[in-house]
Amino acid sequence: MADLKPYIAKAASGEPLSLEDSRAAFDIMMSGQATPSQIGGLLMALRVRGETVPEIAGAVASMRSRMLGVSAPNNAIDIVGTGGDQSGSYNVSSCSAFVVAGAGVPVAKHGNRALSSRSGAADALAALGINIEADASIIGRSITEAGLGFMFAPMHHSAMRHVGPSRVELGTRTIFNLLGPLSNPASVKRQLVGVFAPQWLVPLAEVLKELGSEAAWVVYGDGLDEMTTAGTTQVAALENGRIRTFEITPEEVGLRRCDPAELKGGEAAVNAKALLGVLEGEKNAYRDIVLLNSGAALVIAGNAKDLKEGIALAAQSIDSGAALDVLQKVIAVSNDKAA
């Protein structure tokens, strides 16, 4: 039986793990060969020292090797946040996913139930009537027929059951908060990834580059794990094999700066109602932040030359009814009915 102890000792001494060591350590944890206290020990040793790019890349490689995959077109995109930003905001990435799909880009949306907020992507989408536990073939069909498929993380990463109890008992952020967005079951090559702290912008862009992404923006929105209209968004963009960093304000792309309180969400039912409101054309701060994130995703997808054009295409997706149409089709297909 493989032994996690040498890796714990190495990490605890402050020594970084190589990508190969990290993958081996996570393979041991994800195959049920480590005790909960060993798992907790390694996770906290990494957290206290600060996880490195090779450690994250090795952990992602281990997760990806065990996941239940979903087939999706080559140009599919994901819009996802790490969670853990403690903001309690609306489900921005989920709403943006419908808008991007309505603009003609296939979306393979990966998400989970709430970890630190009151409503995660899965909670809100389930409240809208989407079957979040659809099997992989139905999700693949949903991406093809409806333009969007939702992949509920626990259904695709069953090996996570071996580390779940340790994560719950630790009750604090670990490397696993970073791994979910990087372990998309449809193996998308284009992503908009929100992070809970700015120090992760460049490292996660480097991990995505290391693991073969074609284009990605890793973003932090002044306290939010998405782009924000309540402040300045910091971006690390992976484009053509290079990473560049820049900042975006709402004003420079023609959007109103809002008060952070205007972005506060609530329980799943509240967030689902608000999401539906945006897709039905309500004009408010939630719409604006969705336009910003959707616009960025359309740039990453290659469908818009810049953020202003992306925002215009996103507005058109909502105002034409296309985004709402995607939601209705996803509800139908996920429940195994014709779209």
From Swiss-Prot:
One of its GO terms (biological process) is L-tryptophan biosynthetic process. 5-phospho-alpha-D-ribose 1-diphosphate binds at residues 81, 84-85, 89, 91-94, 109-117, 121. Mg(2+) 2 binds at D225, E226. It holds the Pfam family Glycos_transf_3. Binds 2 magnesium ions per monomer. Anthranilate 1 binds at G81, N112. It catalyses: N-(5-phospho-beta-D-ribosyl)anthranilate + diphosphate = 5-phospho-alpha-D-ribose 1-diphosphate + anthranilate. Belongs to the anthranilate phosphoribosyltransferase family. Catalyzes the transfer of the phosphoribosyl group of 5-phosphorylribose-1-pyrophosphate (PRPP) to anthranilate to yield N-(5'-phosphoribosyl)-anthranilate (PRA). This is Anthranilate phosphoribosyltransferase. It comes from Brucella anthropi (strain ATCC 49188 / DSM 6882 / CCUG 24695 / JCM 21032 / LMG 3331 / NBRC 15819 / NCTC 12168 / Alc 37). The gene is trpD.
